[in-house]
């Protein structure tokens, strides 16, 4: 198990991902009813409509430093398919909407489905935020002053010295027991070979 700070960083990363996914869902599947109706003026705008601008049918420009083979290959390749053609077929048009910039978007969810998914996404965000709050609350030193933390560090250093002393004593006892065992094994070995 990772330490608390690593868990906290992971939860923050997951929360950011959940925020992004929630925003993507909300912008993609809402009913897309404009808050204000579009202007109905008949005066043409200063910018020409994109549909009236002719498209270049030629291949993209190639730098002068490119080899001749690359130029001939790019000229031999067929032009990309024209995606500006309007969609035909009512069934396919019902499944996707055309946005002003021409991108196809999925059909919006029904209001009940959209509301249910909104609640689910909000609940997931709240749960992740509660996990983050819990991890922050269990971080050491949150509710103590600097002096209390220094006192606690000194206490822990004292406990560590005591434990290290006990460890050193056990290591010496182990050395004594090892020497005694070697002596017993030496006597047994001499006794076994002396009978032969």
UniProtKB/Swiss-Prot annotation:
SUPFAM superfamilies registered for this protein in UniProt: Mediator hinge subcomplex-like (SSF140718)
One cellular component (GO) term of this entry: mediator complex
Listed Pfam families: Med21
Annotated GO MF terms: transcription coregulator activity
GO BP annotation list: regulation of transcription by RNA polymerase II
Region annotated Disordered, chain positions: 52-111
Coiled coil stretches, renumbered: 144-174
Main localization, broad class: nucleus
InterPro entries for this protein: Med7/Med21-like, Mediator_Med21
Biased composition (Low complexity): 65-76, 87-98
Taxonomy, superkingdom: Eukaryota
Subcellular location: Nucleus
UniProt KW Transcription regulation keyword: yes
Role of this protein: Component of the Mediator complex, a coactivator involved in the regulated transcription of nearly all RNA polymerase II-dependent genes. Mediator functions as a bridge to convey information from gene-specific regulatory proteins to the basal RNA polymerase II transcription machinery. Mediator is recruited to promoters by direct interactions with regulatory proteins and serves as a scaffold for the assembly of a functional preinitiation complex with RNA polymerase II and the general transcription factors.
Assembly: Component of the Mediator complex.
Name this protein carries in UniProt: Mediator of RNA polymerase II transcription subunit 21
Gene behind the chain: srb7
């Amino acid at each position: 198990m990772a330490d608390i700070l690593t868990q906290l960083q992971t939860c923050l990363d997951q929360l950011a991902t959940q925020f992004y996914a929630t925003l993507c869902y909300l912008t993609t599947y809402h009913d897309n009813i404009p808050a204000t109706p579009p202007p109905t003026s008949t005066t043409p705008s200063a910018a020409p409509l994109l549909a009236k601008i002719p498209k270049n049918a030629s291949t993209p420009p190639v730098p002068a430093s490119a080899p001749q083979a690359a130029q001939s290959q790019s000229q031999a390749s067929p032009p990309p398919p024209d995606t500006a053609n309007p969609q035909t077929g009512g069934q396919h048009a019902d499944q996707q909407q055309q946005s002003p910039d021409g991108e196809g978007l999925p059909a919006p969810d029904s209001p009940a489905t959209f509301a249910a998914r909104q609640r689910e996404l909000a609940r997931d965000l709240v749960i992740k935020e509660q996990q983050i709050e819990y991890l922050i609350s269990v971080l050491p030193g949150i509710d103590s002053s600097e002096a209390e933390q220094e006192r606690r560090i000194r206490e822990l250093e004292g406990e560590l010295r005591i434990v290290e002393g006990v460890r050193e004593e056990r290591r010496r006892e182990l050395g004594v027991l090892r020497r005694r065992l070697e002596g017993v094994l030496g006597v047994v070995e001499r006794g076994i070979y002396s009978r032969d």
